[in-house]
Amino acid sequence: MKVFIYPTYDPKRDKSGNLYIDHFRKAFEADRNWEVLNRCPRSETLGLLLNLRAELFILHWVDLIPSKPLGRLQTLFFRLGVMAAKRRGARIVWLLHNKGAHDDRSSRPARLMDWMASKADMVLTHSEEGCRFFRQRYPSSTAPCHYIPHPVYTSEIYPSAAVPEWDYIIWGGISRRKRVLEFVRFAAGCEALADKKILICGACRDSALDAEIRVALPPFIYYENAFLSDGELAARISASRCVLFTYDGGTVLSSGALIYSLNFLKPIKGPAVGSFSDLSEIVSCYSDFGEIPLLPLKDVRAAALSYIADNSWADFPVKVLSLRAEL
Protein backbone atom coordinates (compact mmCIF):
# COMPACT_ATOMS: atom_id res chain seq x y z
CA MET A 1 0.00 0.00 0.00
CA LYS A 2 1.40 3.38 -1.00
CA VAL A 3 1.60 5.78 1.94
CA PHE A 4 2.62 9.42 2.28
CA ILE A 5 3.68 10.63 5.71
CA TYR A 6 3.46 14.30 6.65
CA PRO A 7 5.73 15.94 7.62
CA THR A 8 8.17 14.60 5.08
CA TYR A 9 11.61 13.70 6.32
CA ASP A 10 14.91 14.34 4.59
CA PRO A 11 17.87 13.36 6.82
CA LYS A 12 20.17 15.66 4.85
CA ARG A 13 17.94 18.66 5.49
CA ASP A 14 16.07 17.98 8.72
CA LYS A 15 18.28 19.10 11.60
CA SER A 16 15.48 19.27 14.16
CA GLY A 17 16.45 16.05 15.90
CA ASN A 18 12.85 14.83 15.54
CA LEU A 19 13.38 11.18 16.41
CA TYR A 20 9.67 10.43 16.15
CA ILE A 21 9.13 11.20 12.47
CA ASP A 22 12.44 9.58 11.52
CA HIS A 23 11.50 6.33 13.27
CA PHE A 24 7.93 6.55 11.97
CA ARG A 25 9.03 6.72 8.36
CA LYS A 26 11.71 4.03 8.73
CA ALA A 27 9.21 1.65 10.33
CA PHE A 28 6.91 1.88 7.30
CA GLU A 29 9.84 1.63 4.89
CA ALA A 30 10.98 -1.60 6.57
CA ASP A 31 7.54 -3.22 6.33
CA ARG A 32 7.01 -4.95 2.97
CA ASN A 33 3.26 -4.20 3.08
CA TRP A 34 3.97 -0.49 2.61
CA GLU A 35 5.60 1.69 -0.03
CA VAL A 36 6.54 5.11 1.35
CA LEU A 37 6.29 8.06 -1.05
CA ASN A 38 8.49 10.90 0.13
CA ARG A 39 9.09 13.65 -2.39
CA CYS A 40 10.39 16.47 -0.20
CA PRO A 41 9.87 20.06 -1.38
CA ARG A 42 11.12 22.95 0.73
CA SER A 43 7.55 23.60 1.80
CA GLU A 44 6.57 20.38 3.60
CA THR A 45 2.85 21.00 3.12
CA LEU A 46 3.39 21.22 -0.63
CA GLY A 47 4.54 17.61 -0.36
CA LEU A 48 0.92 16.45 -0.22
CA LEU A 49 0.37 17.76 -3.75
CA LEU A 50 3.58 16.13 -5.00
CA ASN A 51 2.75 12.67 -3.65
CA LEU A 52 -0.80 12.15 -4.87
CA ARG A 53 -0.06 8.59 -5.97
CA ALA A 54 -0.36 7.59 -2.32
CA GLU A 55 -3.38 5.54 -1.28
CA LEU A 56 -3.05 6.56 2.34
CA PHE A 57 -1.97 9.90 3.84
CA ILE A 58 -0.86 9.92 7.49
CA LEU A 59 -0.76 13.47 8.84
CA HIS A 60 0.98 14.61 12.03
CA TRP A 61 1.02 17.90 13.99
CA VAL A 62 -1.67 19.73 12.05
CA ASP A 63 -1.84 22.21 14.93
CA LEU A 64 1.70 23.45 14.17
CA ILE A 65 1.14 24.36 10.51
CA PRO A 66 -0.31 27.88 11.03
CA SER A 67 2.76 28.94 13.06
CA LYS A 68 5.27 27.78 10.44
CA PRO A 69 7.08 30.37 8.27
CA LEU A 70 4.53 31.63 5.73
CA GLY A 71 1.93 29.87 7.85
CA ARG A 72 -1.09 31.09 5.91
CA LEU A 73 0.40 29.86 2.63
CA GLN A 74 1.44 26.56 4.21
CA THR A 75 -2.09 26.12 5.55
CA LEU A 76 -3.47 26.74 2.05
CA PHE A 77 -1.11 24.14 0.53
CA PHE A 78 -2.11 21.68 3.24
CA ARG A 79 -5.84 22.13 2.67
CA LEU A 80 -5.44 21.86 -1.10
CA GLY A 81 -3.32 18.73 -0.70
CA VAL A 82 -5.84 17.00 1.55
CA MET A 83 -8.74 17.85 -0.75
CA ALA A 84 -6.82 16.72 -3.85
CA ALA A 85 -5.92 13.43 -2.14
CA LYS A 86 -9.54 12.76 -1.19
CA ARG A 87 -10.74 13.54 -4.72
CA ARG A 88 -8.34 10.86 -5.97
CA GLY A 89 -9.82 8.34 -3.55
CA ALA A 90 -7.00 8.33 -0.99
CA ARG A 91 -7.78 7.81 2.68
CA ILE A 92 -6.71 10.34 5.30
CA VAL A 93 -5.39 9.32 8.73
CA TRP A 94 -4.86 12.09 11.27
CA LEU A 95 -2.46 11.24 14.07
CA LEU A 96 -3.59 13.46 16.91
CA HIS A 97 -0.66 14.34 19.18
CA ASN A 98 -1.98 17.40 21.02
CA LYS A 99 -5.26 18.96 22.11
CA GLY A 100 -4.11 22.19 20.49
CA ALA A 101 -1.05 24.25 19.67
CA HIS A 102 1.29 24.58 22.64
CA ASP A 103 2.50 28.10 21.89
CA ASP A 104 0.23 29.64 19.22
CA ARG A 105 -2.72 31.11 21.13
CA SER A 106 -4.50 32.45 18.04
CA SER A 107 -7.62 30.76 16.67
CA ARG A 108 -5.84 29.49 13.55
CA PRO A 109 -4.62 26.13 14.92
CA ALA A 110 -8.07 25.32 16.32
CA ARG A 111 -9.75 26.22 13.02
CA LEU A 112 -7.39 23.97 11.08
CA MET A 113 -7.91 21.13 13.56
CA ASP A 114 -11.69 21.56 13.23
CA TRP A 115 -11.32 21.31 9.46
CA MET A 116 -9.02 18.30 9.75
CA ALA A 117 -11.56 16.48 11.91
CA SER A 118 -14.14 16.92 9.14
CA LYS A 119 -11.80 15.47 6.49
CA ALA A 120 -10.12 12.59 8.32
CA ASP A 121 -11.21 9.03 7.53
CA MET A 122 -9.54 7.77 10.70
CA VAL A 123 -7.87 9.30 13.75
CA LEU A 124 -5.04 7.69 15.69
CA THR A 125 -3.68 8.87 19.01
CA HIS A 126 -1.05 7.76 21.52
CA SER A 127 -3.28 8.19 24.58
CA GLU A 128 -6.69 7.01 25.71
CA GLU A 129 -7.47 10.61 26.60
CA GLY A 130 -6.85 11.49 22.95
CA CYS A 131 -9.80 9.34 21.89
CA ARG A 132 -12.04 10.88 24.55
CA PHE A 133 -10.90 14.37 23.57
CA PHE A 134 -11.59 13.73 19.89
CA ARG A 135 -15.12 12.47 20.52
CA GLN A 136 -15.95 15.38 22.84
CA ARG A 137 -14.32 18.10 20.73
CA TYR A 138 -15.55 16.87 17.33
CA PRO A 139 -18.90 15.12 17.96
CA SER A 140 -20.02 15.51 14.34
CA SER A 141 -17.05 13.56 12.97
CA THR A 142 -17.82 10.03 11.80
CA ALA A 143 -14.14 9.01 11.68
CA PRO A 144 -13.19 6.08 13.95
CA CYS A 145 -10.58 6.97 16.57
CA HIS A 146 -8.08 4.42 17.86
CA TYR A 147 -5.47 4.42 20.60
CA ILE A 148 -2.10 2.93 19.65
CA PRO A 149 0.56 3.26 22.37
CA HIS A 150 3.60 5.38 21.52
CA PRO A 151 6.38 3.05 20.28
CA VAL A 152 9.67 2.89 22.17
CA TYR A 153 12.82 4.13 20.46
CA THR A 154 15.01 1.17 21.38
CA SER A 155 14.88 -2.16 23.19
CA GLU A 156 18.16 -1.35 24.97
CA ILE A 157 17.99 -1.05 28.74
CA TYR A 158 20.27 1.61 30.21
CA PRO A 159 22.05 0.82 33.49
CA SER A 160 21.71 3.02 36.55
CA ALA A 161 24.63 4.65 38.29
CA ALA A 162 25.81 2.75 41.37
CA VAL A 163 25.30 5.87 43.49
CA PRO A 164 22.64 8.32 42.22
CA GLU A 165 23.80 11.92 42.05
CA TRP A 166 20.33 13.46 41.70
CA ASP A 167 17.00 12.75 43.35
CA TYR A 168 15.04 14.18 40.42
CA ILE A 169 15.86 15.02 36.82
CA ILE A 170 13.76 17.27 34.58
CA TRP A 171 15.11 16.98 31.05
CA GLY A 172 14.36 18.10 27.50
CA GLY A 173 13.88 21.38 25.69
CA ILE A 174 12.76 24.06 28.14
CA SER A 175 9.77 26.19 27.17
CA ARG A 176 6.98 27.90 29.07
CA ARG A 177 4.47 25.14 28.37
CA LYS A 178 6.62 22.71 30.36
CA ARG A 179 6.15 24.79 33.54
CA VAL A 180 9.78 24.50 34.60
CA LEU A 181 9.76 28.04 35.98
CA GLU A 182 6.57 27.38 37.94
CA PHE A 183 8.09 24.23 39.41
CA VAL A 184 11.31 26.02 40.39
CA ARG A 185 9.30 28.69 42.20
CA PHE A 186 7.21 26.03 43.92
CA ALA A 187 10.26 23.99 44.94
CA ALA A 188 11.99 27.05 46.39
CA GLY A 189 9.25 27.29 49.00
CA CYS A 190 8.64 23.57 49.55
CA GLU A 191 10.26 22.19 52.71
CA ALA A 192 9.67 18.60 51.56
CA LEU A 193 12.02 19.16 48.61
CA ALA A 194 14.68 21.19 50.41
CA ASP A 195 16.83 18.11 51.13
CA LYS A 196 16.60 16.82 47.53
CA LYS A 197 19.07 17.36 44.71
CA ILE A 198 17.28 18.29 41.49
CA LEU A 199 18.79 18.59 38.02
CA ILE A 200 17.10 20.56 35.24
CA CYS A 201 18.87 20.06 31.92
CA GLY A 202 18.00 20.99 28.35
CA ALA A 203 18.22 23.85 25.91
CA CYS A 204 16.20 26.97 26.65
CA ARG A 205 16.00 29.25 23.62
CA ASP A 206 13.80 31.79 25.40
CA SER A 207 16.31 34.20 26.97
CA ALA A 208 13.66 35.85 29.13
CA LEU A 209 12.52 32.49 30.50
CA ASP A 210 16.13 31.46 31.10
CA ALA A 211 16.73 34.62 33.13
CA GLU A 212 13.56 34.11 35.19
CA ILE A 213 14.55 30.53 36.01
CA ARG A 214 18.03 31.59 37.13
CA VAL A 215 16.60 34.25 39.45
CA ALA A 216 14.19 31.76 41.05
CA LEU A 217 16.68 28.89 41.57
CA PRO A 218 17.06 27.60 45.14
CA PRO A 219 20.46 26.15 46.12
CA PHE A 220 19.34 22.50 45.76
CA ILE A 221 18.37 22.83 42.06
CA TYR A 222 21.12 22.70 39.44
CA TYR A 223 20.13 24.23 36.09
CA GLU A 224 22.00 23.33 32.91
CA ASN A 225 20.86 25.29 29.85
CA ALA A 226 22.54 23.26 27.10
CA PHE A 227 21.78 20.96 24.20
CA LEU A 228 22.96 17.53 25.36
CA SER A 229 24.17 14.68 23.18
CA ASP A 230 22.43 11.32 23.56
CA GLY A 231 25.34 10.06 25.63
CA GLU A 232 25.37 13.10 27.90
CA LEU A 233 21.62 12.86 28.46
CA ALA A 234 21.75 9.13 29.16
CA ALA A 235 24.49 9.66 31.74
CA ARG A 236 22.41 12.27 33.57
CA ILE A 237 19.23 10.18 33.61
CA SER A 238 21.19 7.11 34.76
CA ALA A 239 22.58 9.16 37.65
CA SER A 240 19.09 10.16 38.85
CA ARG A 241 16.63 8.38 41.13
CA CYS A 242 13.47 9.65 39.44
CA VAL A 243 12.45 11.33 36.18
CA LEU A 244 10.07 14.25 36.73
CA PHE A 245 7.77 15.85 34.16
CA THR A 246 6.21 19.22 34.96
CA TYR A 247 4.18 19.69 31.76
CA ASP A 248 1.08 21.84 31.46
CA GLY A 249 -1.69 19.33 30.80
CA GLY A 250 -3.79 21.84 28.88
CA THR A 251 -2.61 20.74 25.43
CA VAL A 252 -0.45 17.63 25.87
CA LEU A 253 -1.78 14.15 25.05
CA SER A 254 1.43 12.13 24.68
CA SER A 255 5.13 12.60 25.28
CA GLY A 256 8.11 11.24 23.39
CA ALA A 257 10.32 12.19 26.34
CA LEU A 258 8.23 9.97 28.60
CA ILE A 259 8.69 7.02 26.23
CA TYR A 260 12.44 7.67 25.92
CA SER A 261 12.71 7.60 29.72
CA LEU A 262 11.19 4.11 30.03
CA ASN A 263 14.40 2.37 28.98
CA PHE A 264 16.13 3.60 32.14
CA LEU A 265 13.63 1.66 34.31
CA LYS A 266 13.42 4.64 36.65
CA PRO A 267 10.46 5.77 38.74
CA ILE A 268 8.64 8.54 36.87
CA LYS A 269 6.37 11.29 38.17
CA GLY A 270 4.18 13.31 35.82
CA PRO A 271 0.88 15.17 35.44
CA ALA A 272 -2.34 13.15 35.50
CA VAL A 273 -3.06 13.61 31.79
CA GLY A 274 -2.75 11.72 28.51
CA SER A 275 -0.14 9.01 28.19
CA PHE A 276 1.14 9.74 31.71
CA SER A 277 -2.19 8.48 33.07
CA ASP A 278 -2.26 5.56 30.60
CA LEU A 279 1.05 4.33 31.99
CA SER A 280 -0.15 4.43 35.59
CA GLU A 281 1.78 1.23 36.42
CA ILE A 282 4.95 3.14 35.58
CA VAL A 283 4.11 6.82 36.17
CA SER A 284 3.09 8.20 39.55
CA CYS A 285 0.67 10.96 38.56
CA TYR A 286 -0.01 14.20 40.39
CA SER A 287 -2.74 16.82 40.07
CA ASP A 288 -0.64 19.66 41.46
CA PHE A 289 3.01 20.18 42.37
CA GLY A 290 2.26 19.80 46.07
CA GLU A 291 1.64 16.08 45.56
CA ILE A 292 5.07 15.42 43.99
CA PRO A 293 7.10 14.92 47.20
CA LEU A 294 4.30 12.78 48.66
CA LEU A 295 4.28 10.23 45.82
CA PRO A 296 6.39 7.13 46.57
CA LEU A 297 9.12 5.96 44.21
CA LYS A 298 7.72 2.67 42.97
CA ASP A 299 9.48 -0.25 41.33
CA VAL A 300 8.60 0.10 37.64
CA ARG A 301 10.95 -2.52 36.17
CA ALA A 302 8.39 -5.21 35.27
CA ALA A 303 5.83 -2.76 33.86
CA ALA A 304 8.42 -0.82 31.86
CA LEU A 305 9.93 -4.00 30.40
CA SER A 306 6.47 -5.21 29.41
CA TYR A 307 5.67 -1.92 27.64
CA ILE A 308 9.02 -1.96 25.82
CA ALA A 309 8.43 -5.54 24.62
CA ASP A 310 4.89 -4.82 23.37
CA ASN A 311 5.43 -1.49 21.61
CA SER A 312 8.29 -1.53 19.13
CA TRP A 313 8.41 0.67 16.04
CA ALA A 314 8.43 -2.48 13.90
CA ASP A 315 4.97 -3.33 15.27
CA PHE A 316 3.45 0.07 14.52
CA PRO A 317 2.81 -0.35 10.74
CA VAL A 318 1.30 -3.78 11.49
CA LYS A 319 -1.12 -2.20 13.96
CA VAL A 320 -2.11 0.45 11.41
CA LEU A 321 -2.62 -2.19 8.70
CA SER A 322 -4.90 -4.16 11.04
CA LEU A 323 -7.29 -1.17 11.02
CA ARG A 324 -7.43 -0.98 7.22
CA ALA A 325 -10.94 -2.45 7.04
CA GLU A 326 -12.29 0.64 8.82
CA LEU A 327 -10.88 3.06 6.26
Please describe what each predicted stretch is.
Residues 118-136, 140-157:
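Donor nucleotide-sugar binding/catalytic pocket of nucleotide-sugar-dependent glycosyltransferases
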Residues 105, 135, 146-166, 179, ...:
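Acidic anion/phosphate-binding donor-loop and adjacent secondary structure
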Residues 161-178, 184-188, 198-201:
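Conserved donor-binding/catalytic core segment of Leloir-type glycosyltransferases
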Residues 197-210, 226:
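Glycosyltransferase donor-sugar binding loop
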Residues 210-231:
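Nucleotide-activated donor-binding/catalytic signature segment of Leloir-type glycosyltransferases, i.e.
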Residues 235-252:
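Acidic donor-binding loop of glycosyltransferase active sites
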